[in-house]
From Swiss-Prot:
Keywords: DNA damage, DNA repair. One of its GO terms (molecular function) is ATP-dependent DNA damage sensor activity. Residues 378-391 have a biased composition (Low complexity). This protein is involved in the repair of mismatches in DNA. It is required for dam-dependent methyl-directed DNA mismatch repair. May act as a 'molecular matchmaker', a protein that promotes the formation of a stable complex between two or more DNA-binding proteins in an ATP-dependent manner without itself being part of a final effector complex. It comes from the Bacteria. GO terms for biological process: mismatch repair. CDD domains: HATPase_MutL-MLH-PMS-like, MutL_Trans_MutL. It comes from Escherichia coli O157:H7. Pfam families: DNA_mis_repair (PF01119), HATPase_c_3 (PF13589), MutL_C (PF08676). This is DNA mismatch repair protein MutL. The keyword Zinc does not apply.
Length: 615
């Protein structure tokens, strides 16, 4: 058979084999086009599981009459124009293949009107050459796409369609995923003339949990822990279910989005699973709805025919970022049981962590339990006090316990003979537990502090080094080891290998786990403060240091590591300085009482004040 150019219809049908797998694939492509057009309302009508009819109507910007024919042509799109656009894609579609592929295996009709046009126009393609016919029509601003008799001209594909119920369930799942991605869009889904789903838009700043509950169910909502995590250009937000209460049914909720695009990414799933593995059984899976925002230049979405997968340019960074974000919210959720007193005490009141550097010292207040990760709290009844926004919401509770908790909260506390008040320091004395208030950043790495009218300078890199040393030094329990996604394998000499074997127990207390063979050592886990470090530089230097030692004390090794860690902040900001000082005050109180000279230096203002007065 000679080489020949395939007819347009056959070429489109071949492309449809990748894009149009089943009716749900058609719905996904068309709804994503509506979202790219700026629609705020999308109505989806399905008949016979999508095999008979798929109708998508939106109120987006519409398509101009002159561009209708192009819209049904292959490789025609308004979303990209150059390679630079492709490498930083932010729209859901970009290849320009969907409409041409769908129209080649169905009877597709496209009706659209823009705000500038007085009338709407309708286009459809037919025949071997896919000639497009355009005619006037009646239609509001927006677009309607009707897909009739899917796979009518490809009997083999139609034969592989499942039952009407199964195909509609796939469509329903696609709409659920899209509705979770765009809370600002109203989506209505009907099947055989009956409304099945109505997802109302959530206004900016509104309660997204209401829609989350409508999609994922109240069981997920009651166990959902809210996540807000950011590092540089990476942002992670959403919800992860408490692993201690995750059921097999709940574990079916696994939705992940990258820049608003729904994904099935093994790297992301691995990071989440690894963060939850201590609380999940071997055969359990986590439940989550997570949104990852990343610089579009750092992710390639053009790696899968149906755009279900992406490739990250810095996959290790993304994995560790997600792992730490999920792990942090799970660690906040853990509560250490408090010893029971002989007499009942008032319920603990969660307060934010210490931020004396910003102007207030919460450590001067009565001790309370640590706040847990935020969960969803149901909205109050009409006329009651509004519930707090979810970042500050109280822990969720099981339905059967709700009434009991409500009664307990409404029951007045029994009268008790007041205890003699214990002597307490006045509130101002709490300043002894803090460095003071951050006024500004000087020379990019020093914080100018004010305390009791005195001014001092604090070296932020030195404070960070002290904090890292405390975080690395094992207490009653060893430092928690964080497994590396890609273990680090290094070649070592006989002397270095011998030193590592002698220091193995001390390194294990610091959270550093390794395996050694004849001439190599493989680092399998490191403590959390080392996750963002360049381990290919730090670990060889650490091995060289150990080879020169005769005694291996965890404290000395932790001190050496802390002194050799690279700071994550070349230019310190006020927020970073405040956060650092709060952590140092909490974990290193001895530094506040007796700060070393290399950390804190007082600034004498008297000569300057005297000079001003003399003038």
């Amino acid at each position: 058979m000679p080489i020949q150019v395939l007819p347009p219809q056959l070429a489109n049908q071949i492309a449809a084999g990748e894009v149009v797998e089943r009716p749900a694939s058609v719905v996904k492509e068309l709804v994503e086009n509506s979202l790219d057009a700026g629609a705020t309302r999308i109505d989806i009508d399905i008949e016979r599981g999508g095999a008979k009819l798929i109708r998508i109507r939106d109120n987006g910007c519409g398509i101009k009459k002159d561009e209708l024919a192009l819209a049904l042509a292959r490789h025609a799109t308004s979303k990209i124009a150059s390679l630079d656009d492709l490498e930083a894609i932010i729209s859901l579609g970009f290849r320009g293949e969907a409409l041409a592929s769908i129209s080649s295996v169905s009877r597709l009709t496209l009706t659209s009107r823009t705000a500038e046009q007085q009338e709407a126009w309708q286009a459809y393609a037919e025949g071997r050459d896919m000639d497009v016919t355009v005619k006037p029509a009646a239609h509001p601003v927006g677009t309607t796409l009707e897909v009739l008799d899917l796979f009518y001209n490809t009997p083999a594909r139609r034969k592989f369609l499942r039952t009407e119920k199964t195909e509609f369930n796939h469509i329903d799942e696609i709409i659920r995923r899209i509705a979770l991605a765009r809370f600002d869009v109203t989506i209505n889904l009907s099947h055989n003339g009956k409304i099945v789903r109505q997802y109302r838009a959530v206004p900016e700043g509104g309660q997204k949990e209401r829609r989350l509950g409508a999609i994922c169910g109240t069981a997920f909502l009651e166990q959902a822990l809210a996540i807000e995590w950011q590092h540089g250009d990476l942002t992670l937000r959403g919800w992860v279910a408490d692993p201690n209460h995750t059921t097999p049914a709940l574990a079916e909720i696994q939705y992940c989005y990258v820049n608003g695009r729904m994904m099935r990414d093994r790297l992301i799933n691995h990071a989440i699973r690894q963060a939850c593995e201590d609380k999940l059984g071997a055969d359990q899976q986590p439940a989550f709805v997570l949104y990852l925002e990343i610089d579009p230049h750092q992710v390639d979405v053009n790696v899968h025919p149906a755009k279900h997968e992406v490739r990250f340019h810095q996959s290790r960074l993304v994995h560790d970022f997600i792992y730490q974000g999920v792990l942090s919210v799970l660690q906040q959720q853990l509560e250490t049981p408090l010893p029971l007193d002989d007499e009942p005490q008032p319920a603990p009141r969660p307060i934010p962590e210490n931020r004396v550097a910003a102007g207030r010292n919460h450590f001067a207040e009565p001790a309370v339990r640590e706040p847990v990760a935020p969960r969803y709290t149901p909205a109050p009844a009409s006329g009651s006090r509004p519930a707090a926004p979810w970042p500050n919401a109280q822990p969720g509770y099981q339905k059967q316990q709700g009434e009991v908790y409500r009664q307990l909260l409404q029951t007045p506390a029994p009268m008790q003979k007041p205890k003699a008040p214990e002597p307490q320091e006045p509130a101002l004395a709490a300043n002894s537990q803090s460095f003071g208030r951050v006024l500004t950043i000087v020379h990019s790495d020093c914080a100018l502090l004010e305390r009791d009218g005195n001014i001092s300078l604090l070296a932020l890199p030195v404070a960070e080094r002290w904090l890292r040393q405390v975080q690395l030094t094992p207490g009653e329990a060893p430092v928690c080891a964080q497994p590396l996604l890609i273990p680090l394998r290094l070649k070592v000499s006989g002397e270095e290998k011998s030193a590592l074997e002698k220091a193995q127990s001390a390194l294990a207390e610091l959270g550093i786990d390794f395996q050694s063979d004849a001439q190599h050592v493989t680092i399998r886990a490191v403590p959390l403060p080392l996750r963002q470090q360049n381990l290919q530089i730090l670990i060889p230097e650490l091995i060289g240091y150990l080879a020169k030692q005769s005694v291996f004390e965890p404290g000395n090794i932790a001190q050496w590591i802390a002194r050799n860690l690279m700071s994550e902040n070349a230019q310190w900001s006020m927020a970073q300085a405040i956060t650092l000082l709060a952590d140092v005050e909490r974990l290193c109180p001895q530094l506040v009482k007796t700060p070393p000279g290399g950390l804190l230096q007082s600034v004498d203002l008297h000569p300057a004040i005297k000079a001003l007065k003399d003038e």
